[in-house]
Structure formats: structure tokens, C-alpha cells
Amino acid sequence: MSKEKFERVKPHVNVGTIGHVDHGKTTLTAAICTTLAKVYGGAARDFASIDNAPEERERGITISTSHVEYDTPARHYAHVDCPGHADYVKNMITGAAQMDGGILVVAATDGPMPQTREHILLGRQVGIPYIIVFMNKCDMVDDEELLELVEMEVRELLSEYDFPGDDLPVIQGSALGALNGEEQWEAKIIELAEALDTYIPEPERAIDLPFLMPIEDVFSIQGRGTVVTGRIERGILKVGDEVAIVGIKDTTTTTCTGVEMFRKLLDEGRAGENVGALLRGTKRDEVERGQVLAKPGSITPHTKFESEVYVLSKDEGGRHTPFFKGYRPQFYFRTTDVTGDISLPEGVEMVMPGDNIQMVVELISPIAMDEGLRFAIREGGRTVGAGVVAKIFA
């Protein structure tokens, strides 16, 4: 029992495999689990159990994802692997599986392929901060120069999308070789694990970030003032803190004079908790659902941004028909819908259900946002798409 307790204090990091179809993402996932279980203890997983990924629904979107776990001496990893290309696209855009780092798998026999590029671009758009490269199938390439050439190509491709291509770790290995217990290739899996430990920094915990709470409801309490309720997304709210009310209207600041949870008064509310915050001197009609309460200066309201969007297919309950420029749906951010105009990339006339697309959105009223914020696209309360803010313009 004491051992189990000790394990739990290890830092937790979320990673995943990305890359072109058949380059060996799932085989690598199995090889990591198996090799690390052999060396450091833990549960081995075979290819079949990972490849048979269960379907999940995230905001109405069907995604097949396999979740595996493994340990290094320093950390505990949660790792996602998807069977199909479409699953990766959906996963990255919805943030169903947030990654602190990605393992880009490239077959040495093929070099970078179209989906290699697309996954790198998506990684950039959705904010995967770190990428480590695993060059797979190196046991099938005899020519040392060819391996160097592929490595150079991959590094250049990553640099093209603003990843530090020259500096990031590239490990040349064979996932199948490691899975079959061949020592020289098992050593490469250990090398990959060491790269994960050293190259991907420990993610900041939600509680250590600046305070932010999306406002879900507003009440006025006779003689005490206005209370806003919501679930704290990040940081800590203490009684006496100055807070900003951001989005929809002009930003205002006030002081939090009380924090309560389940009708009990607290000194503070923390990330993940549902609380009510009493605001000094704020009138009931000055705040509304859809705004956020935040540490002053930590987040700003915006109306225009570039986004990466996945459009639900008909089977997922999405649209049955394409949409064109001039489409004006609602964009659902955190707790509220805001109407917006879209512009499509040059040369794109229409967007079909099931597509993923980059679009520039201009909202009719400002919303508190950072790059990486997720949203849904809705028509009359029905979700027809999912997106992520890639770049803020105004």
C-alpha cells in the first residue's frame, strides 16, 4: 500500500503519438508500454488491445481513442493513440485529449508524408507545445545516409511550422524490434522515455495559473450585493482579491468580498470548485452569463481570430448540407453563444460536413479569450462544429 501512495506524487504528464497512417504509431505505443513495464515495472499492453480503441463522444463528436499509462522513474505518463486520421483531427481540435507533448512517428522507409505535415500543422494550431520525433522502422533501412536524409527532412518540416526543428530530440529506432524484445531497439525506447522526461517540461497545474472563472449565473442578495456563480477554471480566488469582469461589455474591476460553496463561507475558492463570489458595489445588471471573472490584466476580450474547426458529419448529428461564405452561426464560448461572421481560406468555396478547415471568425461582441481556447459552433442550440482559437487578430 505504501508503494502505491508514493507513486501518486509523481508529476503527471499527458502525451500522445501523432503521424502518418501506417508509420507505426500504435506499434510504438505498445512498445513503450511493454519496454517500460519490463524495465521499470507497470502493466504491458499489446498492439491488439491498443488498436481496438473504444469510441467516445466528446461534445457530440464520435472519437475513437486509446488511453494507456506508463511510468518512468521520474514521471507518470498518460498517452493517447488514435486508430484513424479523422480521430486525430477531432481529438486535437476538441481538446478531448490535451497533450503536454507529442511523439511524432515517421517511418524511415517513407520519410515525411501528407498526414505527417497535417499533424504538425494541427499541433501548431491547437497549441501542442513540444514535439519529440521517433523515426520508426530503422531496422529496414541499411543506408546510414538515407536515415540522415530523412531526419533532416523531418527537422526542416518542423521548423517550417515554428517548432525548433534543429534542437528537438530525434530518436532512430524500431518499435516492432523493441516489441519483439530485441535489445538494441529496446534501448531506443528507453532513450525515447528519457527524452520525454527531459525535453517536455512539467506542465503548470491549473491551480498555479492566474485566476479565471466563467460566469454561469448572477444573483442579487438583499443587503449583500451581487453574487456570480461558476466553476473556477484556473487559479485561486481569495476574499479581498481584486477581480476583473471581462467580455461582452467593457471590462470593469471590482473586489471579491466573499466566496461561498454549498452555502458555506470560505476564505478562498480553488481551480475545479463550483463557487459563488460576492462582488462589491456591482449591480445585478452589470454582469451576465458569458463573461468571466479573472485576475486583472490576465485575459483580454477579443472579437476577431483565426481558428481550426472540425465540422460535424451528418451521422454525428451535424449539418446535412455544406455551408458557404456568409454563414453566420453562433459560437459557444464557455457558457454563452455569440453570433459571428466567418471567412474561408482563399480558394475554398464551401465546407462539407466532416471537413476540418481553418477559418477567420469575427464575433459581434467581444469574448475573453486566449489562444488555445475551445468553442462549439451551434445553430439554434444544436452543435454543428468544434473549434479552437489558433491566433488572435483583434
UniProtKB/Swiss-Prot annotation:
Its catalytic activity? GTP + H2O = GDP + phosphate + H(+)
Report residues binding Mg(2+): 26
Question: Short name of one Pfam family for this protein?
Answer: GTP_EFTU_D2
> Which controlled-vocabulary keywords does the entry list?
Cytoplasm, Elongation factor, GTP-binding, Hydrolase, Magnesium, Metal-binding, Nucleotide-binding, Protein biosynthesis
Entry EC no(s): 3.6.5.3
Where is the segment annotated G1?
19-26
Q: Where is the tr-type G domain?
A: 10-204
One GO MF term on file is:
translation elongation factor activity
A GO-annotated cellular component = cytosol
Matches recorded under InterPro entries = EF-Tu_GTP-bd (IPR041709), EF-Tu_GTPase (IPR050055), EFTu-like_2 (IPR004161), EFTU_2 (IPR033720), G_TR_CS (IPR031157), P-loop_NTPase (IPR027417), Small_GTP-bd (IPR005225), T_Tr_GTP-bd_dom (IPR000795)
Q: Please give the residue ranges the record annotates as the region G5.
A: 174-176
Region G2, residue ranges: 60-64
Q: Could you say which residues bind GTP here? A: 19-26, 81-85, 136-139
Subunit relationships: Monomer.
Which function does this protein serve? GTP hydrolase that promotes the GTP-dependent binding of aminoacyl-tRNA to the A-site of ribosomes during protein biosynthesis.
Tell me its family.
Answer: Belongs to the TRAFAC class translation factor GTPase superfamily. Classic translation factor GTPase family. EF-Tu/EF-1A subfamily.
* Protein name per its UniProtKB record: Elongation factor Tu 2
Q: Which organism is it from?
A: Vibrio vulnificus (strain CMCP6)
